[in-house]
């Protein structure tokens, strides 16, 4: 399995998309840097740049990038007509597809880590003290895991549609926008923990996890009002990671099952 993961990483060297994607991870932090002039405190500066990473980069960039990269990884052997040779070796197709999914997981973590470090550089360059930054940096790494799990349904769709890239990308686009909207809608942010959209979809799930870690010692009236409405519905680590572990097991099993049954 480790050898397969290493091979998948070596393939990434030939994919400009990977490096372009990592460059995109710095786009939101750099764009938000222009708004730091209106910030009054170090805490607000850190909260602001990290919220741009959590609520913009993760939702609007990372999830679709994971699906696009997955479509490249999953069908590379078919496009180059090498899957037959791999099966003859033999290479277990379940292990092959799972190694690709693990590479995507590492990419998601790397994406959030790079974005977080760029945020730190922006803060230091503009003279802000990174108060509470490292705590939020760790939360960002964990959100990368949540976004990876959130992308698995779309990756399953990519495998089911079997190289129909356009349809997959269109559906992923709407799924991404839907998650972004759900993460800002009180109707879904104030649902109790259970089998509902506010718990099972990555957008509201990630918001109800990450928002509680912002430094709330100095809050505006609007933020205080939002906290009053949403804080009773914050989720703890056991709840959040319990959900994503179950979802990951289910969708990885389905992806592996469909991938194994595809014709070579």
Predicted segments — roles?
Residues 21-25, 100-101, 169-173, 244:
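Residue-level recognition of transmembrane alpha-helices
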Residues 260-264:
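Short cytosolic juxtamembrane segments of multi-pass membrane proteins
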Residues 1-22:
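Aromatic- and glycine-rich beta-strand/loop motifs that create alpha-glucan
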Residues 39-49, 169, 173, 177-258:
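Terminal transmembrane helical anchor/hairpin motif
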Residues 72-105:
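Helix-loop-helix units of permease transmembrane domains in multi-pass membrane transporters
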Residues 66-70, 79, 83, 118, ...:
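Hydrophobic/aromatic residues in alpha-helical transmembrane segments
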